[in-house]
Amino acid sequence: MAKLIKHGSEGREQVLKGVDILADAVKVTLGPKGRNVLIEQSFGSPKITKDGVTVAKSIELKDKIRNAGAQLLKSAATKAAEVAGDGTTTATVLARALAREGNKLVAAGYNPMDLKRGMDLAVNAVVEEIKKSSKKINSQEEIAQVGTISSNGDKEIGEKIAKAMEEVGKEGVITVEEAKNFSFDVEVVKGMMFDRGYLSPYFVTNSEKMVAELENPFILLFEKKLSNLQPMLPILEAVVQSQRPLLIIAEDVEGEALATLVVNRLRGGLKVAAVKAPGFGDRRKAMMEDIAILTKGELITEDLGMKLENVSIKSLGTAKRVTISKENTVIVDGNGDKKNIEDRVLQIKSQIAETTSDYDKEKLQERLAKLSGGVAVLKVGGATEVEVKERKDRVEDALAATRAAVEEGVVAGGGVTLLHASQTLRNLKVDNKDQQAGIEIVIEALKDPLKQIVENAGENGGVVVGKLLEHKDKNYGFNAQDMQYVDMIKAGIIDPAKVVRTALQDAASVASLIITTETLIVDEPSDKEDSIPPMRGGMGGMGGMDF
């Protein structure tokens, strides 16, 4: 295909136009008085959201070069969401400010590589300042405050997240699902999470969140590697007849077996996902036995003379729901017998008491926590499907931000920490004026998140920034909800340090890429329609399956 090539400032200007289009759509959601964005869906009713990354992900531009800029900015928002669970709009606002100011200086003749070095120095200094000023959170009240702010001021969400953490511990497994009624409840169910993700992204059922969600699945636990599905045909046929999904947990699923599962998943004949078993060696076997007890299934092991071809559907475990991400698998509400689970817990406790190895003790305690801790489920209800989905998005954001706060502590919110941190950059020593200009870019950009929060509340951002910079107290800020100047920490307006840090680092990374880019190569726009016909789903034969 022919390529379109642009050099220098001409290309960068077009990239920045794409950055501006995406940033203008996302920035309106920032702060307690941020607005909603309505997004057309390919099917069903439109989505209404105040979540920056959801807005960013929905944007594709027709112009290829502008779209390249939008996609770069989208990557900053997406990365912030993946690492810290929040801060996506802050990352977008910062990245746009850094890229815009940097491009102006490059056009004025400054060296882009030295500008980048100056920006990197400044960002590292601000990150250290954020770490220094962060405060650990311990109380339920502080956890609720973080959840409230991250869910756009919804106190109920903050309180429910704090309650869920109290039930299963700060490191415990908490999931979010839609309720069948108007209420918003916390329920603790039998469940387990382990650190193994899907073996192929083709198993994903929710492409927006990149997770595989299996409702009421069968669970096959196999001790060895699966490289050929031939021995499994009888059990696979039985699962297809039941019209329920299947989760395969094995030492590994590889080659022909994995390819066949993927093909059948894509053709819709078999709702399936496969993950590697957690742990190694003897510990792997023990953990698989734990999962078997939790789900009322059997571990298919050759030690007991069991063979895959002889396995019936009765040997499979079951659970209410399984969610699989790139890195983790969460089994919610396994159908295991309560007494069997309690007996297994007692057995592990006695092993902990008997072992002399610190390492073994630690691993046994991990197993005990997984088996006995349970899973807290936040059940989100509402009057309409649109309302439930919008609220569920906010709950998921708030939960991720609260976890980040527990991990790295909190700082003053509302853009105040970044604003005051910018003033510590005046004393940085650099090699030349171009690097100094890079530092100045960061100093100016760090004002933008606070300005945007204030402007979304209907006030003048520049005036508020000026007033705050006159004040020596680093926690002194502007409460955009009540339109008052307050001590942000005392007022409970706090942000997770990890969210603020990640937003800045991801924004600087993307902005640096833009200002150091000299040539752009994209596909030449084509007037022809796509000549490839759409794929047809399903195949004849055994339930659309192809073994």
Curated annotation (Swiss-Prot):
Source organism? Rickettsia felis (strain ATCC VR-1525 / URRWXCal2) (Rickettsia azadi)
Reported EC number(s) for this entry are 5.6.1.7
Gene Ontology molecular function:
ATP binding; ATP-dependent protein folding chaperone; isomerase activity; unfolded protein binding
Give the family, as the similarity comment puts it.
Belongs to the chaperonin (HSP60) family.
Comp. bias regions, Gly residues = 537-547
Origin organism lineage: Bacteria, Pseudomonadati, Pseudomonadota, Alphaproteobacteria, Rickettsiales
For the ligand (ATP), the binding residues are T29, L30, G31, P32, K50, D86, G87, T88, T89, T90, G414, D495
Q: How does it assemble?
A: Forms a cylinder of 14 subunits composed of two heptameric rings stacked back-to-back. Interacts with the co-chaperonin GroES.
Protein name as annotated: Chaperonin GroEL
Give the start-end ranges of region Disordered.
525-547
Question: What InterPro entries does the annotation carry?
Answer: Chaperonin_Cpn60_CS (IPR018370), Cpn60/GroEL (IPR001844), Cpn60/GroEL/TCP-1 (IPR002423), GroEL-like_apical_dom_sf (IPR027409), GROEL-like_equatorial_sf (IPR027413), TCP-1-like_intermed_sf (IPR027410)
Give the record's keywords alphabetically: ATP-binding, Chaperone, Cytoplasm, Isomerase, Nucleotide-binding
Give the CC-aspect GO terms.
cytoplasm
Please write the reaction equations for the catalytic activity of this protein: ATP + H2O + a folded polypeptide = ADP + phosphate + an unfolded polypeptide
Query: Which compartments is it annotated to reside in?
Result: Cytoplasm
